[in-house]
Amino acid sequence: MKLGMVTYELGKAMDLKTLLATCRETGFKAVELRTTHAHGVELGMPEAKWAETKTMFADSGVELWGLGTVCEYHAVDQAVVRRNIEQTKQWIELAAHVGARGVKVRPNGMPKEVAQEKTCEQIGLALAECGKAAADAGVLIHLEVHGAVSSNPKLCQKMMEACDHPSVGVCWNSNNNPDEVINGSIATTFPLLSKWIKSCHITELSSNYPWRELFRLLKESGYDGATLAEIPASAEPARLMRYYRALWEAYQA
């Protein structure tokens, strides 16, 4: 496995050149770029920037792990769902142009007026449509285990079963909540999603989440991808990232 970062908070104000230089300096090997932040990798970016972005990542040795979108498919209003599917397809096209491995999407809640099983199926079918577009473009879809109620691994399992597309995987999100961590362990919840895991977010490694168990289970499942730090910003990002990498490496021992 390798250490990377999500620019949701840490790194969000960095332009792409600064971000890649900081990652290279601190030993971070992969990046998920949160969209709408300072990096400039967005829908509508000039086509001339596509190759430039791809080259910048290639020259840096840092992998563009994914584009972190807020596309979601749980809405009751089907027009909203359709709009999110079509926007996901646009992100997929951009990901292919700039050399990103994947596109991160999410569930973001479960409407109370709709049966959970129906919403899970709706999300899964939307993911399957996006998965076909992703396969055609040579990228992946990463479904983040996210949202109130919808982050329950049992529900995400239902979404993935309804999806059933090889280009769609799960982004394990290291949620320290009772749906995921049971009696201090993820031994019963991790297996629900392990066969689909294609990405992984990690948070503050100083928290009481079972980090050693997570890293062991990831390795045992055959996962050899990035574990992406999604942590608060710092006035000294490079200094924080060095300490974070040291702690991450200690957990691998």
Where are these regions (language model features)?
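Histidine-acidic metal/acid-base catalytic patches
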Residues: M1-G4, K12-G27, S150-A253
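Structural preference for beta-strand elements that scaffold enzyme active sites
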Residues: K2-T7, A30-E32, G61-G68, A100-K104, ...
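Active-site beta-loop-alpha junctions enriched in small/polar residues
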Residues: V6-L10, R34-A38, T69-E72, N108-M110, ...
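Short, N-terminal intrinsically disordered low-complexity segments that are rich in Pro/Gly
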Residues: E9-A13, L43
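Active-site acidic/histidine proton-transfer and metal-coordination neighborhood
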Residues: M14-K17, A21-R24, K54-E63, Y73-V170, ...
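N-terminal substrate-binding region of glycoside hydrolase catalytic domains
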Residues: G27-M45, G68
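A generic structural signal for short coil/turn motifs at secondary-structure boundaries
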Residues: G40-L43, V114, P178-V181
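Glycine-rich, positively charged N-terminal anion/phosphate-binding segment
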Residues: E42-A58
